C-alpha cells in the first residue's frame, strides 16, 4: 500500500487559463473552455481506477474504500489504519463530494500526506485544525477557493514538512496570514493565484522560502515593488505572474539572479523592452510568455540570447518587422505565438530556419500568400494558426509538405473551395477551422478523405443539407460547428450517427425544429449542445432525456422557456451546469 507515499511531488503548479466571457451566439470556443473547467461528476469518479472492459471489476481495496465511505457516519477515528488506507478513504470522500465537517474529524491525527480540498464547498478555518493535526507527515495542502482566513493559515505553522501549498482565490487571507509561510522552509511549490491578500509587503514572507521551485502569483495585482523579496530564491524554476498588471521594468531587475528559471509567465504586465533586457542571463529559460506586454521587436535582441528557449509567446505585443531578424537565433523554438502583431511577409523570411517549430500562431497578422512560402520547410509543424490573415488559395500550395500538421485554422482568410483540395492532402489533420463564408458544400466534399478529423469548425461556412451528407465520412468527430443558417432537420440526419461527438453547435440555423432534437437524441456522449436561434420548442426537450453527459445546453432565441429548462435540469439532466435560457 505504498502508492500514496511514493507518488511524485515535483509537478508544476497549474497555471490555468484566463476566464473569458462569450457573446450570446458565440462560437464553441466558450464550450471548449467549459469542458476544461467543469468539475467531475460522481460517475466520473466512480470509474476512476476501475476497469470498464468486459470481465473487469473493482479491486478488493477499492471495494473496501467504497464501503467505508458509504458508512462513514459509523466511524469516529481512522488513526489505527495504515496511512495509505486512510489517505485513499479521504481522497474518495473528497472526489465524491461526501466529506463533511463532521466526517473530517475521523481523520484527525492520521498522518495524512495530502490534503487536497481545492474548490471543495464549505472549507473554512475550523477544518484547518484537522488538517494541521497531520503535523510533520503533511506534504501537500490545497485549500483553493475556500473561506480560510489568517487564523486558519496560522494553524499550519507547525506543519513544517509541507512541500506544496495552494491557496488560489483565497480572499480571506491577508498579508498578515502570509507571515506564517516564513517558517515553511521546505516548500517547493506555492500558489496564490488571484489572491488579493498577496501584497508587496506580504511578500516579505517569501524571502525565507529558499527551496521554492514553483511560484504562482497569477492575477495578484498588488505585488508591484515586492519582487525584491524573491531575489535570493535561486532554486526557482517556474514563476507565473500573468495578469499582475502593475508589474513594471523596475520589478523585473530583481529576477536577474534567478538563473535557474525555466518558465517565466509575464503576460499583461507593464513590461517594456527594458524589462526584457534584464532576462539576458537566464540561459536555462525554456518558456517565456510576454503576451499583451508593451514590448517591441527591439526586445528580440535580448531574447535571441536565450538559447534554451522552446516556447515564446509575443501575442498582442507591438511587434513590427524591424528587428525580427533576431528570431533566426532561436533554433530550439517549438512554439511561437506572434498573433495580433503588425508583422508582414517580410518577418516570415526570418522564421524559415526555425525547423524545430511545432506550433506557429500568426492570427490577424498582415501576411499573405507570398509570406507563406517561407513556412514550407517547417516540416515538424503540428499546429498552424492563420485566422484573419490575407492568405488565400494560392498560398496553400506551400503547405503541401507539412505532413505532420494536425491542426490548421483558416477562418476569415481568402481561402476558397478550390483550396480545399490542397488541404485534403494533409492526411495527419485532426482539427480544421473553416469559419469562412467562401467555403461551401463543394469545399466540404473535397475534405471527405480526412477521415481522422476529430474537430471541424464550419461556423460561418455556407453548408446546406446537400453538403451535410459529407458529415457521414467523419466518424471520429468529437466537435462539430455548422452555423451558416442553411441546415434543416433533413441535414441533421447526417449527424445523428456521429456517436463520438461531445460538442455540437447548430446555432443560427433558423429552420431547425424539434425534429432535430429527436434526431440527435442518440448522441449520448454530448457534453455541450447549442441549437440557439432556431424553431426548437418546449415540446422537443423530451428528446434530450438520454443525454446524461450534457453539461452545457444553449437554446437562446428559440421557443423554449426558462421555466421548462429549469424543469429539465431538475427532473432529467441533473449534470447540467450551464443552460440558456435560464
PLM region descriptions:
Residues 95-101, 121-126, 146-153, 171-176, ...:
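Short, solvent-exposed loop/turn at the beta-strand->alpha-helix junction
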Residues 5-50, 524-534, 547-582:
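Leucine-rich repeat domain C-terminal region
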Residues 113-118, 139-143, 163-168, 187-193, ...:
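Conserved hydrophobic beta-strand positions in leucine-rich repeat
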Residues 134-135, 158-160, 181-187, 206-210, ...:
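Leucine-rich repeat
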Residues 2-140:
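Cullin-RING E3 adaptor/co-adaptor recruitment helices
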Residues 452, 459, 476, 483, ...:
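Ankyrin-repeat and related helical/solenoid repeat scaffolds used for protein-protein interactions
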Residues 95-209, 213-219, 228-232, 239:
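Alpha-solenoid helical-repeat scaffolds
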Residues 1-11, 18, 23, 295, ...:
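Long, low-complexity, Ser/Thr- and acidic/proline-rich intrinsically disordered regions
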